[in-house]
Swiss-Prot record:
Protein's cellular compartments: Cytoplasm
One GO BP annotation of this record: DNA repair
Protein name as it appears in the record: Cell division suppressor protein YneA
Boundaries of every LysM domain copy: 40-94
NCBIfam families xref list: PRK14125.1 (NF010723)
One term under GO cellular component: cytoplasm
Role summary: Inhibits cell division during the SOS response. Affects a later stage of the cell division protein assembly, after the assembly of the Z ring, by probably suppressing recruitment of FtsL and/or DivIC to the division machinery.
Species of origin: Priestia megaterium (strain DSM 319 / IMG 1521)
CDD domains hit by this protein: LysM (cd00118)
Matching Gene3D superfamilies: LysM domain (3.10.350.10)
Similarity-based family: Belongs to the YneA family.
Pfam families attached to this UniProt entry: LysM
Length: 109
């Protein structure tokens, strides 16, 4: 009987450790997720580049041009090659909060 309790104790500890690791990994991996519902999207037109978009929206974000480009590449799953071959009609998330653009449009009207 004592051996049974001893092995059950080991199983309980094992599953507790697995549960704790799963919880921690969920928190760590989920921390990098961006709530895209808060961010604006832009539709690419002919000749647009990520650097130009950064400059166009510079009053609406507080990133350097390189940080802006990196954010757009990461969130939209672009690499350097695909970022340079954007096509008209492509839609991209940009690091500009929707409410920032909405407030600016309201002020200008």
């Amino acid at each position: 009987m004592q051996q049974f309790l001893h092995s059950m104790k080991h199983y309980a500890i094992f599953f507790a450790v697995i549960a704790a690791l799963t919880y921690v990994l969920t928190l760590v991996l989920g921390a990098d997720k961006v709530d895209l519902d808060k961010y604006s999207t832009v539709t690419i037109t002919k000749g647009d580049t990520l650097w130009e978009l950064s400059n166009k929206y510079h009053n609406h974000h507080h990133l350097t041009t390189n940080e802006f480009v990196k954010w757009v590449e990461d969130v939209n799953d672009l690499n350097s090659d695909t970022a340079q071959s954007l096509s008209p009609g492509d839609k991209l998330y940009i690091p500009v909060l929707k409410k920032e653009l909405h407030n600016q449009v309201a002020i200008e009207q």
